[in-house]
Amino acid sequence: LKLSLWAGDQQATTHILHEKEITEANKSGRSNDPCYTIFRANGTVEKLYAGLSKLIKMHSITTMGVCVNSDELSRLYPGETNPKLTIALQMLLENYCHFLKHNTATGDICYESLQEPGNQPLRQRFYELEALGTMYYTPHFFQTHIGDIEFCGKNENLAGLQLADFIPNTMARSAARMPPKHDSF
C-alpha cells in the first residue's frame, strides 16, 4: 500500500501511516512532515482508505475496540471512578480473551505508547487483571491466553500499529451513529 501511495519514492516503506497527520494534511494542506503532502489530494486519501479496507478484508483481519460514553459513565456512576482508559483496557482485554478462547489461540497486546507516565496506569491495570482475573475470566485463563503487553512507539513503523491507528475514529463514528468519513472504510 505504501509503495502505491508514494509511487517512485525510495523511502516509501519508511513512511508511517498516521491518521492525525494525514487528516491534517488533507484538511489544512499543512504537515510537520513533508511525506504527508501527498494527502492534500482527496484522491490519495480515498486510495489510502480503500487500500486499508482491502487489506482488512483480504486478510480477514478481526478488529475490536471499545467506546466509553463519558456522559453515561458519569451519570450512572457518579463520584470517583477508574480512569476511562483503564476501564476501556479492561473491556478490550475481556473481549480479546473471548476472541482467543473461541479461536483456540494465544496472543500478546501491542499498544501504541503514550507519553509517560501514560503507559504506567495501563501496564498496572494489565498486571492486576493478569494476577486477579477479570469479571469473566480467571487469572489462570487470562495468563494462559494472553502473553504480555508491550508499548511500542509510532516511529517503530509497525504495520499492525499503523493499521490500528485508523480504527478508533471509524468505530467512534459508528457508535455515535454518524456516517463514515470514507465510504470504503
Regions inferred by a protein language model and the residue ranges of each:
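Phosphate-ester processing/binding pockets and catalytic centers
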Residues: 1-185
